[in-house]
Amino acid sequence: LNTTVKHLVDALTQKDKALADMQTRLDEMTEELKLLRKKLFGSSTEHMSNPYVNSDQLTIYPFLGIEPEKESEPIEAEYIEIQSYTKSKKAKSTLKEQFSNIPVKQVFIDSLSDEDKLCPACGTEMQPIGTEIIRREVIHVKPSMYMLEYVGTTYGCPVCKDTEDPQFVKDNKAPAALIKGSYTSPSLASWILYEKFAKSVPFYRLEKSLEELGAKVSRTTMANWAIQCNSLYFKHLTDYFHRELLKRKYLMMDETPIQVLHEPGRTPESKSYVWLMRSGNDGLPPIIYYRYAPTRSGDVALELTDGIQPGTYLMCDGFSGYNKVKDVRRCTCYAHIRRYFYEAIPAGHDRDITNPAVQGVMYCNKLFSYENKYAERHYKPETIKKRRAKDEKPVIEAFLDWADKQVVTGNSKFSKALTYFKNRRNDLMTYLEDGHCSLSNNWSENSIRPVTVGRKNWLFSSSVDGAEASMNIYTIIEMAKLHGLNRQKYLEYILEHRPSAEMTDEELSLLAPWNKDVQETCGKCDH
């Protein structure tokens, strides 16, 4: 009997444990469902306004162990550069401002008869003495194409033509084709690449658009052109951008998945990755560089950063692969930290300051509020460093102290947020060392967004060559955008000047978007 009872007790204990595990899992799934609903139907921003302000309580931050904010005391005023400004409603742009980048043609009205032009007083024919613009309209010209034929001429000697040794010479030295054996030109190739990568139009839709213009160009042909333009020209320029990037002191990195159908030894469903590397706020011409890689391995991060200067500041998220990068000062992205805590807030508790997830968000918001203030006042990096030490360091210290006091169990969203924050402990204050460092990795996230937007339309790359070409073309296009260039003009400019592996970095720099001649030729934005 005792044995039977023991078995029953053990069985009941196991069932209770299984039931508790199921309840925990149910709670986690419910939390996931609430998060998905919040992402679909809730606010799209993680920033929460502070509604808890009244005459007796100027700020809620003392509740979190942070002293109320006082008026900033000047620190070495010679470093502070404050520009006065007045917030006002943005004036509506004029028609001339709206269309300042398009050419203007004029039609002179000639509706008066000869009789109408006679002076009613003396009968003399009146002469033009001035003009005025009656109205304006914008004309759309449908894109057009034409075939350009290079015609060579053969010259023969009229005297020797009937002899046994007729003499002739051929004038057939036409400019080299963009791609040997192909009929594409810099203008056609640049338009296709601009539509595909800047406007995210898939090749199959471009195929139809070209057919409407009278040209039958298959999507396969267009894809091959992209690959060959990359291997022949773009790659040499983007490699130069990467080499220049490695010389910078402030770097930012991010990555996002893509799908490549035909990778050696991998299934079509395998995840591949786009890696982004860009310059930070260093006062130099900004550089963006994209790289395709079959994996998210830290070896990719190591390869991308091979050759950087020791002591470089690297801003990235908490992905462990970046741990392989040595000799850098890692900066933590507080936007990621805030996002973790924001996603841990239970539905309907966004304004509940007693909720620990809300408190975590408020710590982050406090830091960002200081950064916004520095930007509004146009502080120089030297001043930002001093202000951060005074304003932001105490916030981070209080944040860490608060985190260490939290007691969590299970695998909840808040537990994950807290773990993510604590795991960044060694890097939380790195950005305080230099005023050029940023508080978040938002620049990288914004820079990688064009790839994610394009991915929704074209879904995948067919081959490794196609993926590599795509990333280099994205590099060219986003560099043009970053420097205020017309993206299609810049693509065409590069294809006309044809960078090669034989060019030195000095020669390649003449094709960079910050070059004066490039700015003058391609300098009108298309975005």
Enumerate the predicted regions with their spans.
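Short, flexible loop/hinge motifs at secondary-structure junctions
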Residues: L1-S182, A223, M253, D391, ...
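Catalytic center-proximal scaffold of phosphoryl-transfer enzymes
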Residues: D27, D116-K117, T154-G156, K161-H527
